[in-house]
Amino acid sequence: MNQRINKVLEQMNNRGIDHLIISDPSSIDYLIGYKNHPGERMYVLLLKNDGNHTLFLNNLFYLDQELDLNIVWYNDTDNCVEVLSEYLQEANCVGIDKFWNAKFLLPLMEYTNGETHYELGSICVDYVRMKKDEHEQELMIKASQINDAAIDEMIKLCALGNMSEKEVANKLADIYRSLGSDDHSFTPIVAYGKNCADTHHEGDDTMLKPGDSIIIDMGCTYQGYCSDMTRTVFYKEVSEEQKRVYELVRDANLAAEAIIKPGVRLCDIDKCARDFIKEGGFVAEFNHRLGHFIGRDVHEYGDVSATFDMEVEEGMVFSIEPGVYIQGKFGVRVEDLVLVTKDGCKILNSYTKDLLVVG
């Protein structure tokens, strides 16, 4: 049995869960090394505390590898939920991951005996995925190195001054491929001027003009692991207000990163950056959490926010991305990924955070 599944079983035992239904393809791949995109069909990895694990798979899907667990095949004419229920008749507490569709869960509850208890069990896998092993860390470091190189190319394109937000964003896929990345990890954000005040702006036909801020928020995947970073630069000139806001956000980023080490609460890291920006005169203008966890998915369980008081542990990887957004004028965000080490953290992005005026 692999170490990852052993760690999940330990979490199940701690929570009194004897059967765990996992439907998230990313988590199934993480645990058994099998990739599948089931669409609307039932796809379940059932973990049992006795070690007798089973994968439920529609026979339309292709399996070309040996898996060290039971495989139950079903077809479209079978009642797949009834098939699954036969493996839960002795269950006392069934954990369900947060992705499983109600169209499967609700009928399953009718098939199993009335004494079976169901509860949200995602944390059993989520907690294990929060802490990256050495191989995962190496892949995420490489993904961030690719991102550093790619954002340099993106900023050079912006400096030309003759491409719209959308045109620059559309160049990124080719840049990533040339650097050895698999794909985007999310749709990139390229925003100019007042559009930078929209934290999730969708690139359009806006063109640059002197004095505009430029936000580029982008990420790639490398061998299944994600990167994510943001830099803000300025086109041709920068005002004193823009300079002050940029330095405030950049220094908030640095201050938060400086306190990261095992034992520090994630909410206190958020507070560090938020208080720093508040002292600079901005409260409502910093309108999102400080960061999110990342790995196989660009947004994984856990965040760096006022409401998440978990303590940092070695091997965790998350973003630090303070921002100030002044509606109708401009916005600034600076984002790195950090890897928690034994006594601090490693910043995975090396691209400069000095104030840059391009073009």
Feature map (PLM): residue ranges:
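Active-site neighborhoods and metal-handling regions in enzymes and metal-associated proteins
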Residues: 1-359
